[in-house]
Amino acid sequence: MYLKGENIGFGYNENNLILEDVDISLGSGDVLGLVGDSGCGKSTLCRILAGYEKNYKGKVSLDGSKISSSGYNPVQLIFQHPEKAVNPKWKMKDILKEGHDVSQDILEAFGIKENWLNRWPNELSGGELQRFALARALGPKTKFLIADEITTMVDAITQAQIWENILGIVEELDIGVLVVSHDKSLINRLCHDVLYMSDLNGC
């Protein structure tokens, strides 16, 4: 299975294009890195691939077909700031159940403690919230995971643990991963191949 973006263009006006004629392809089981400076359109491209942006040029497809806007999205996007992806009025146990029932194995893999489940989002740290976001995203119907600077808020040891768990789970489930980061050393450790926004988008 392939997630493809073809001739992707995006901008708030014709004289200020953030993306122009960008092509990207990610296969099942691939771990692909995406590197670029701030302002080069990395996050915008992620949002387009995951269906968050609608007013773009070009085509996004899953094995040649348009991704349905209803039901569970097989392309899951994890944001740099997880607090933006949770409902502050829900307890964490309810947030986890939003898309599917998360297995105990995945909860344990990400070190999610049982007493965290009855807390509100504002009672957890950014790193703890990110663990919930990852557990929720790695559902049985997920085919691709887009990770946009997801471990910038944690220390190096925690970063290594989180990525070790992600890579183990996605390998088992044959999920393709797009790892977006400005940290080239992290990208080189994790990824099978690397794309540079300077090559894709000329910036």
Description of each model-found segment:
Residues A50:
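Helix-to-loop junction immediately C-terminal to a conserved catalytic motif
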Residues W120-L124, E128:
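Conserved ABC ATPase signature
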Residues K57-G71:
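Conserved ABC transporter NBD signature motif
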Residues L134, I146:
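Hydrophobic anchor residue at the start of the ABC signature
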Residues V35-D37:
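The feature captures the beta-strand-to-loop junction immediately N-terminal to the Walker
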Residues M1-G5, G9-D21, S28:
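A short, flexible loop at the N-terminus of ABC-type nucleotide-binding domains that lies
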Residues H81, P88-V102:
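Q-loop/switch helix immediately C-terminal to the Walker
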